[in-house]
């Protein structure tokens, strides 16, 4: 994972402005500790902090077109770059082996109308000195973070993390996923549009577990491209287990040579983190033994987690409760991963949003509401799980890739008939009894990959990551923050925090730390803020009258469902849900 900084509409190139850009870039050097680069020309400055994954010898940035008239700083991975390079064979003189250089070739031919050609994760700033124009863009879901800032003098700032912009520009905001900004026609323009965003376009579609399997396997294989050692995050839940199993099935051959040669690092390493005795750890070990990875189990103590909290909030740049809770163990894990020489990991983010995997989806009143909620969840993912996974890992110079959010796979999964994803329908088995597997969340994914996993994992009920690493972690956070924040402080919370006023003491505590790092109004507004139960959107609170006065993002907040899962009694869980329906 790299880091970028750019300043556009520069009226005069001065040593002071170059020094300023270097200082901004230095604040995000943790994202790219391998090399630093900067280019100043015309009305632009582009700086880059590199984490070398593909073409480590010659892929330094910024990147230049053959005539030097276009310059590019990009944080990302373009998974279909080889196919694009083949299209331009003999027509474009590539200067490096970097996967991201295809952006320049596409821009030279198509102008700004090329973003749909890319399958990857990216955030980039491109300066065209010939036209004195710039283009900024972000990937379809917002896997890669990006912020844009403005000054009254007309300067436009871009950075991978808000810490580079804090105090350097008058206002800034998250750059919207699936959008671009072209200086010749200013303003955010949406480039990523899909028919599946509307329920009417998918309600009569078919559903195929075979299609899910084939498409996800292809996505994982694409995303394994790497010239450095890589691994997988294996929590022991369904999503990470599926990604790990698929990755292991391809790990012996080098993807970059179309599997014609052996992999440079043929043994796949898997990583799990949690408190001792955490639910995730035993299941992760079971999966690792089953698929044959070299497994590493990282234990942390509650005190170690608490000690890291302030640093974690600085790196992840949020005070959202769910994100902070889950980021601490991931941040601690990333440090160990980096110490072992691993620079890239694949993980399972996105599956719960696509397939309705959170426990509250059991309450979806219809297929239409179910589908609309998945679309809402995906539209907000850049503010939650994508942010957590990216920034927790990049704090230690580790890149995270998320095959469930692959652009091609997303189309297959989101065009699947929503009725096949729902977990509230209970078809009878041949014996006439209710089939417990029929009502569990993400059933179509489980059916697609059950032959690759131990049965007790393939059909294990959902645990949120922060719950699964150890329940006492969440309980301690609630207790500590409740004791640290007084009732009087909460009574006057709106006076201290008029923007996104904290809804509970835990949020107040995190917000106070966040404000120490990032005191601006722009920073406060950059964080999402809405009532939630078990990671729901605010809209989904209408599904259950009891949820309207609750605000607990833990999966345990969904009454009756999670307690049964803890007992390991899937049949009882299904029957309880059936009784309540």
Task: Please give the residue ranges for each predicted region.
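Glycine-rich beta-strand-to-loop/alpha-helix junction loops that act as flexible
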Residues: 236-237, 347-350, 469
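Short, basic, helix/turn surface patches
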Residues: 125, 320-331, 375-378, 485-491
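Hydrophobic (often cysteine-bearing) scaffold residues that line and stabilize catalytic clefts
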Residues: 17, 96-99, 118, 205-212, ...
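ATP-dependent adenylate-handling ligase core
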Residues: 209, 273-334, 360-369, 388-399, ...
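Adenosyl-5′-phosphate
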Residues: 1-4, 339-346, 365-366, 370-581
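Short acidic/histidine-rich active-site segments
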Residues: 342-352, 358
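Short, hydrophobic alpha-helix immediately C-terminal to the catalytic nucleophile
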Residues: 104-105, 241-248, 331-335, 356, ...
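Cysteine-centered catalytic environments shared across enzyme families
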Residues: 1-319
